[in-house]
Amino acid sequence: MNFVQQNREGDAILVSLRPDTLEDYIGQEEVKKKLYIAMKAAKLRNEPLDHILFSGPPGLGKTTLAFVIAKEMGKNIHITSGPVLERQGDIAAILSSIEEGDILFIDEIHRINKAVEEVFYSALEDYKVDIMIGKGPTARSIRIGLKPFTLVGATTRSGLLSSPLRNRFGMILELQFYTVKELMEIIKRACKIMNIEIEESAAQLIASRARGTPRIALRLLKRVRDVATIRKENKIISHLVEKTMDILEIDKLGLDEMDRKILRTLIEIYDGGPVGIEALAATLNLEIDTLKEIHEPYLLQQGLIIRTPRGRVATGIAYEHLGYPSKISGGLFDESLRKSDES
């Protein structure tokens, strides 16, 4: 397992660093503005907040925002995930226990069983669920009334949501990668909470290698803290960060060994591409979902690869970063290839 895939490692500490309010939440300014207006209006009307869908790559704060919403609205939050909702009875049991105005947070909502998803339609619109009892000719439908609630869904692949489910969300908010400056603020806030002293330059080094992702920034901070502890250093300084990054094999762009392996495979085995995602994943012995959800978004955002109708292509930036001679000068090569594939 590479560093970026360690989504659950040390999550207890990460949870303790979560902000409780929108004011304390750093970054995602446009999303925060929309949430502030929606929550304030719902409070003034004394009604539940509209259903919300958060989408974006892992680690950008979708779960944290769900907790912030519950805290700001003064309501309880009920947490589950799409893959565990296998039967209609599963969702009926959760929905029937919800109090008025509560928040139901469903992570990986795109992975909900389709039969369960259909139960949601009436629950989200009319606050009622119809459950089938029994099988065959003796089967009958029971309607259960629900207290008004707010569904907050989180997905890394919003395109996999069916239109009927997607259309029942009143707000669909796309989370963006964070800037280095925003990540520095998050790192310094975490250091203050954990009583760690850190140099400005050290915070910048960590932030610049965190792939625009708070979760990764905080994990990197923890690893740097480990190195500082072993070396009996009382303050996190730049050389400690650089030493830690060398140990973790994380380069200046924030790429780990698997990221570089993806790019090397594209360049060495597929001559830079294009190559289909299935073939690339099979060559790497990597799950397609891991490639598409964990690694590809950042590689795309950094301009290291592009997607074309014929598959993924390594860009001139990727060749340069890994020290390969470019087949053709970066920008011209990338643009001409993109146009030829789109024509």
From Swiss-Prot:
Question: Where do the record's region annotations for Small ATPAse domain (RuvB-S) lie?
Answer: 179-249
Q: Report the record's Gene Ontology biological process terms.
A: DNA recombination; DNA repair
Which residue windows are transmembrane per the record?
none
Q: Which segments carry the region annotation Large ATPase domain (RuvB-L)?
A: 1-178
- Please list the residues that bind ATP: 17-18, 59, 62-64, 125-127, 168, 178, 215
* Annotated keywords: ATP-binding, Cytoplasm, DNA damage, DNA recombination, DNA repair, DNA-binding, Hydrolase, Nucleotide-binding
Gene Ontology CC, one term = Holliday junction resolvase complex
Which stretches does the entry tag as region Head domain (RuvB-H)? Answer: 252-343
Q: In the UniProt record, does the keyword Cytoplasm occur?
A: yes
UniProt subcellular location = Cytoplasm
Tell me which residues bind Mg(2+): 63
Q: Taxonomically, which superkingdom?
A: Bacteria
The residues listed in the UniProt record as binding DNA, with positions renumbered to this chain, are 307, 312
**According to the UniProt entry, what is the EC number of this protein?**
3.6.4.-
| PANTHER family tied to this protein | HOLLIDAY JUNCTION BRANCH MIGRATION COMPLEX SUBUNIT RUVB, PTHR42848
This protein's domain notes: Has 3 domains, the large (RuvB-L) and small ATPase (RuvB-S) domains and the C-terminal head (RuvB-H) domain. The head domain binds DNA, while the ATPase domains jointly bind ATP, ADP or are empty depending on the state of the subunit in the translocation cycle. During a single DNA translocation step the structure of each domain remains the same, but their relative positions change.
Self-association and partners: Homohexamer. Forms an RuvA(8)-RuvB(12)-Holliday junction (HJ) complex. HJ DNA is sandwiched between 2 RuvA tetramers; dsDNA enters through RuvA and exits via RuvB. An RuvB hexamer assembles on each DNA strand where it exits the tetramer. Each RuvB hexamer is contacted by two RuvA subunits (via domain III) on 2 adjacent RuvB subunits; this complex drives branch migration. In the full resolvosome a probable DNA-RuvA(4)-RuvB(12)-RuvC(2) complex forms which resolves the HJ.
Write down the HAMAP family for this protein, in alphabetical order.
DNA_HJ_migration_RuvB
Tell me what this protein is called.
Holliday junction branch migration complex subunit RuvB
